[in-house]
Amino acid sequence: VGFKAGVKDYKLTYYTPDYETKDTDILAAFRVTPQPGVPPEEAGAAVAAESSTGTWTTVWTDGLTSLDRYKGRCYHIEPVAGEENQYIAYVAYPLDLFEEGSVTNMFTSIVGNVFGFKALRALRLEDLRIPISYIKTFQGPPHGIQVERDKLNKYGRPLLGCTIKPKLGLSAKNYGRAVYECLRGGLDFTKDDENVNSQPFMRWRDRFCFCAEALYKAQAETGEIKGHYLNATAGTCEEMIKRAVFARELGVPIVMHDYLTGGFTANTTLAHYCRDNGLLLHIHRAMHAVIDRQKNHGMHFRVLAKALRLSGGDHIHAGTVVGKLEGEREITLGFVDLLRDDFIEKDRSRGIYFTQDWVSLPGVLPVASGGIHVWHMPALTEIFGDDSVLQFGGGTLGHPWGNAPGAVANRVALEACVQARNEGRDLAREGNEIIREASKWSPELAAACEVWKEIKFEFPAMDTL
């Protein structure tokens, strides 16, 4: 048997439309935009090849292994409705191509060099189906939704948070004071901003100490368990773990990590530490829009969300939906379900390309944060349900009477919405009315309603799909 050198079309080896996918395969849905003149089958096969065993030419060492066992296969291609020259290419990867328990390795293959490939004008990873056999090699979230509720002793409602602002420039003592005021007023959590690490104006150890003091003082006053997301993100893994260890020594309930800028290796390391030491882990997605904002290139956030659930985190930021388009609402709810639920059916109308079974991997609480205030509370309660964290930064600290009254206003609005929902009222239709009624017996809420009333609150009844 001679070795035949030379370049041959990818589709001869890597396009296999009659392939039956296995339960152990990792399946990927790519949005492919081929260069002019490149047929979609060749483009799809090129993606499968370059993200698995292929290279640009036939190599002598191909004969030393079994390509059929290890190659990625493009097994289906469909045009994207309403787009010219865009296709969804489905690729199946054999499980043996990936290291166990490593999101880093999975992404290095699937979204590695192939994204710079010349035969493609653009490439976007829309969704991944992670097989049960691979999921079982990951620890996943340190604790998950149920354990978190038990630790905090808070049930039957969303949790309330607030990012401390101004995010950069406060001294540690003033920062701690802002934390104390918010928690005393009725919030469950306050949060370090994602870019608060350890800067000259506030070193991490000072911040940790003052925030812990604020936490314990607010806890003693209110009789509720409180938390502050202490950001452990650092320049090295060792420094990150050092910060997490100090947080544990202070006895606080939760730390935080920026998982995309910090990287999946660091994130998984921290998640393991958190499970071993009883710390909850809040995840911020800084940098996600660099990766997921372009419609035709990069990676959809639902893939980053699935990767986080594998790598480990108990909370993750997931957009707010409010004020966005109806379609985006469905898509956001799609990946919110992927974060929280055990089993999610394929549903293309919500952007879910594959049925995903998470077996016993704990769920992640989605965090709604960014530009929300008390008038949004009915919509947020309806959209996200109980298993979520609602974070009002400016919506707390921007209250005309200060942080604590701002926190009171949010807590009153939330409790009113939860009670109304439990009584069977329709939050979508009666939201404004519910908030107005509640503000009659809460001067703090009335003041908040007055400040933000100009910011329109339009929440049509949800389209049921």
UniProtKB/Swiss-Prot annotation:
Coiled-coil intervals: none
PROSITE patterns: RUBISCO_LARGE (PS00157)
GO molecular function: magnesium ion binding; monooxygenase activity; ribulose-bisphosphate carboxylase activity
N6,N6,N6-trimethyllysine modification, residue list: K4
Cell compartments where the protein resides: Plastid, Chloroplast
Post-translational modification: The disulfide bond which can form in the large chain dimeric partners within the hexadecamer appears to be associated with oxidative stress and protein turnover.
EC numbers: 4.1.1.39
Record PTM N6-carboxylysine, positions in chain: K191
Residues under site feature: Transition state stabilizer: K324
GO cellular component, one term: chloroplast
Entry binding sites for substrate: N113, T163, K167, R285, H317, S369
Class of enzymatic activity (EC top level): lyase
Positions bound to Mg(2+): K191, D193, E194
A Gene Ontology biological process term: reductive pentose-phosphate cycle
Catalytic residues in the record: K165, H284
The UniProt record lists the keyword Plastid: yes
Keywords: Calvin cycle, Carbon dioxide fixation, Chloroplast, Disulfide bond, Lyase, Magnesium, Metal-binding, Methylation, Monooxygenase, Oxidoreductase, Photorespiration, Photosynthesis, Plastid
PANTHER family: RIBULOSE BISPHOSPHATE CARBOXYLASE, RIBULOSE BISPHOSPHATE CARBOXYLASE LARGE CHAIN
HAMAP family: RuBisCO_L_type1
Protein family according to the UniProt entry: Belongs to the RuBisCO large chain family. Type I subfamily.
Additional note from the record: The basic functional RuBisCO is composed of a large chain homodimer in a 'head-to-tail' conformation. In form I RuBisCO this homodimer is arranged in a barrel-like tetramer with the small subunits forming a tetrameric 'cap' on each end of the 'barrel'.
Oligomer status and interactors: Heterohexadecamer of 8 large chains and 8 small chains; disulfide-linked. The disulfide link is formed within the large subunit homodimers.
Job description of the protein: RuBisCO catalyzes two reactions: the carboxylation of D-ribulose 1,5-bisphosphate, the primary event in carbon dioxide fixation, as well as the oxidative fragmentation of the pentose substrate in the photorespiration process. Both reactions occur simultaneously and in competition at the same active site.
Protein name, per record: Ribulose bisphosphate carboxylase large chain
Protein species of origin: Cassia fistula
